[in-house]
Amino acid sequence: MIELAHIVKSFHADKDKSIHAVNDVSLTINDGDIYGIIGFSGAGKSTLVRCINLLERPDSGSVKINGVEMMSLKPKELYKARTKIGMIFQQFNLMPSRTVLQNVAYPLRGMTRDQIRAKVRELLALVDIPDKENAYPSELSGGQKQRVAIARALANDPNILLCDEATSALDPQTTGAILQLLKDLNRKLGLTIVVITHEMEVVKNICRKAAVMDAGKIIESGDVFEIFSSPKHPVTRNFVRTTSNLSKIETLIRDDSPMVKLKPGEVMARLVYIHADVSEPLISYASRAFDIEINIILADVEIVAGVMVGGTVVIFNGQRERIERAMQYYRDKNIRVEVIQDAGIVA
């Protein structure tokens, strides 16, 4: 278990000014979990993850790994503790003049040459590149380089793997393959994985729980499904919208598209299905039941933490009292209703 309590880490911008990269952050990550920490650039997420293995030593606070206070360890004890915390980065950090085998073998100590070769081959098989041991980094694709980095991070059989923007330099297809590999490793090895990213798609794809950071603080945390389906903080809502086709409505409004020009009395709203049990044809039913027109402008369905999350942007047309009853009907069905534009009541 990873337990961070009241972590503070500052950097001096100049003589008289310091910046709180991490400001009073507390976080608990359970064994075997895949936990995401997401935030825009400068939010403090990379500094926070480096506090876990004390690559960045906090100014104050507590860092406990499986009940052991990392801040109080002596240098030799800290070195030993770090061998059980693997880490991968955006830029892979491979040594270009060494083969894949030599790169992966680098952290291994106290083993014979044959034992090292056997261990490296086992790791390369685990990350699905068993035929690359004699290749050099320049001969590998970005995805293959990250697989080598993962193999090296696993060399000492760690319990924890820290991933700092590990897919940011990869194309979407390769990103998906690396995320699937991390999920497989979590299942096979029982690894606790901490994922640092600015991409909500990554969190949605791999994480079970997540925390959202902004200006050095955690502004929202919990189950990924709850964060996606019912974000509470404006920053979180912005992140969620970047992953949904429903966010295109803002572009259509900004461009004054004829698709979204409302007539007097019309209401444009975003409907978000926040529970997995919504299966009725609710648009057509509400249209008939309340005798109003409901026109679908955009629609989207996503799988988040194994659960379907759907949404639509619609325009209601009809008597105001009936529109309001229809929106209340949706709320009663556990559908979140967000009014985007309201053309007012017809005189």
Task: Indicate where each model-derived feature is located.
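Helix-to-loop junction immediately C-terminal to a conserved catalytic motif
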Residues: 53
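Conserved ABC ATPase "signature" region
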Residues: 68-69, 114-131
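ABC ATPase NBD coupling module
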Residues: 70-86, 110-113, 117, 227-231
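Short coil-to-helix segment of the ABC ATPase nucleotide-binding domain corresponding to the Q-loop/switch region
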Residues: 98-105
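Conserved signature/switch motifs of ABC ATPase nucleotide-binding domains
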Residues: 135-138, 156, 163
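A short, surface-exposed alpha-helical micro-motif characterized by mixed small hydrophobic
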Residues: 203-205
